[in-house]
Curated annotation (Swiss-Prot):
EC number(s) stated in the UniProt entry for this protein: 1.7.1.7
Protein name per Swiss-Prot or TrEMBL: GMP reductase
Primary role: Catalyzes the irreversible NADPH-dependent deamination of GMP to IMP. It functions in the conversion of nucleobase, nucleoside and nucleotide derivatives of G to A nucleotides, and in maintaining the intracellular balance of A and G nucleotides.
Gene: guaC
Family affiliation: Belongs to the IMPDH/GMPR family. GuaC type 2 subfamily.
Amino acid sequence: MENVFDYEDIQLIPAKCIVDSRSECDTSVTLGGHTFKLPVVPANMQTIIDENIAAWLAENGYFYIMHRFEPEKRLAFVQDMKARGLISSISVGVKENDYEFIRELKAQELVPDYITIDIAHGHSNAVISMIQFIKEHVPESFVIAGNVGTPEAVRELERAGADATKVGIGPGKVCITKIKTGFGTGGWQLAALRWCAKAASKPIIADGGIRTHGDIAKSIRFGASMVMIGSLFAGHEESPGQTIEIDGKLYKEYFGSASEFQKGEKKNVEGKKMHVEHKGSLQDTLVEMEQDLQSSISYAGGNTLEAIRNVDYVIVKNSIFNGDRF
């Protein structure tokens, strides 16, 4: 690999502005035949999304992916979203009960709009088999497969039938894969995204390592169609985690999908738990993200997300905050 860098190492270079107001800039993105207000999706984690948040996001024009940690509820969830005329977007693993679930979907002629195959190391025979199984049983579903961190993985999952791939091995705030295993894209996630996107012929979803709204624009610049975000979406009024008070301040729980809090056991743990400050309403965060991304588009010299893909950039190792940590 040539240059290795991460989000805080990159600054995008402005181009001549062509809009009178940032409100003229369109942040929408199309994925799998549906158009969404933002190229952003809350992480499919138990402390980030639940049925209520999924329905609210769908009703308001945002993409979502429901988590896979209550498998017994998945069928009813798809039925409910269909009944309400909303997009259905669910996650599966690669275990026998996941295969059973896909068979059940076919038997009931239920076709989720999106199915995300979601395991920590997605470049695997198990994921390839599941992609092929889904495409055989519910071929109309848009299949997102991951997570991966190499061009070879992207090509192989696309060849197997994936409609999009999710890039990121352990760069998230509550993920400790890099510490526990020595592997992953933590610390060079943005370079890994660029590397993978160059090999991709289908959409890429960047997953993990996003710490600021500017990182969304950087992900778009380096090839992401959609950006999955955990920690920035944790801690909202609507978030599923428990609210607790520490020294007079309100916090919410946020834990990784491979943490012992998620698994209920200390076995193959690659995630941790943290408390994030209570952030108010999810809608306020989404509006702020949209406004910041509109500003990014205006700096990129265009009026759609496409403009961001064409800007120049510089690598400024670890210096863009100049001591200012938000």
